[in-house]
């Protein structure tokens, strides 16, 4: 069973940690990472903008960031440790309002997106990889009980 830790550095938007943890567990199991370790951090815009600036040199907030532990020189030291997914709760709320989706469904979408990056998917590596990642995103969202069509706005913008 995956080991999942959830922390928050925001308090303005109520999140359901139990539901997030359950969704992460289901996603990891579906991807075959049954013994994985994952850290999820839920932040506000200010914290996310700081992380985005530090690690991506972009001076703005973003929806989700992933920090894989399985890359680089020491990536094979502890293969079950996947890394960290950082989700911006205010951004998720705004995205839901803009596209007529619930906050929780957008949180699930961003969680799927972040975990897929941790396990090697990268929509920025060309159209083929973007399409594979989009297909896997839709598959996992359906598994979580969402209508994949309701997220076309997000997936279409990833290539």
Swiss-Prot record:
Required cofactor(s): Zn(2+)
Stated role: Single strand-specific metallo-endoribonuclease involved in late-stage 70S ribosome quality control and in maturation of the 3' terminus of the 16S rRNA.
First-level EC class: hydrolase
GO cellular component, one term: cytoplasm
GO biological process: rRNA processing
EC number: 3.1.-.-
Major site of localization recorded for this protein: cytoplasm
Cofactor: how bound: Binds 1 zinc ion.
Organism of origin: Syntrophobacter fumaroxidans (strain DSM 10017 / MPOB)
Disulfide pairings: none
GO MF term (any one): metalloendopeptidase activity
Keywords from the UniProt entry: Cytoplasm, Endonuclease, Hydrolase, Metal-binding, Nuclease, Ribosome biogenesis, rRNA processing, Zinc
Lineage: Bacteria, Pseudomonadati, Thermodesulfobacteriota, Syntrophobacteria, Syntrophobacterales
Protein name, per record: Endoribonuclease YbeY
Transmembrane region(s): none
Keyword tRNA-binding listed: no
Annotated localization: Cytoplasm
SUPFAM superfamilies: Metalloproteases ('zincins'), catalytic domain (SSF55486)
UniProt cross-references to InterPro entries, sorted A to Z: MetalPrtase_cat_dom_sf_prd, YbeY, YbeY_CS
Amino-acid positions noted as binding Zn(2+) in the UniProt annotation, renumbered to this chain: 113, 117, 123
Family: Belongs to the endoribonuclease YbeY family.
Family matches, as Gene3D superfamilies: Metalloproteases ('zincins'), catalytic domain
């Amino acid at each position: 069973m995956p080991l999942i830790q959830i922390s928050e550095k925001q308090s303005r938007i109520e999140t359901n940690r139990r539901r997030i943890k359950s969704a992460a567990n289901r996603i990891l199991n579906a991807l075959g990472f049954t013994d994985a370790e994952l850290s999820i951090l839920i932040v506000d815009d200010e914290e996310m903008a700081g992380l985005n600036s530090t690690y991506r040199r972009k001076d703005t907030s973003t929806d989700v960031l992933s920090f894989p532990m399985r890359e680089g020189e020491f990536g094979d030291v502890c293969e079950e440790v996947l890394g960290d997914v950082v989700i911006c709760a205010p951004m998720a709320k705004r995205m839901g309002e803009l596209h007529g989706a619930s906050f929780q469904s957008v949180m699930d979408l961003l969680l799927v997106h972040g975990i897929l990056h941790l396990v090697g998917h990268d929509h920025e590596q060309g159209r083929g990889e973007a399409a594979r990642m989009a297909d896997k995103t839709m598959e996992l969202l359906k598994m979580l009980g969402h209508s994949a069509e309701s997220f076309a706005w997000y997936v279409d913008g990833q290539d």
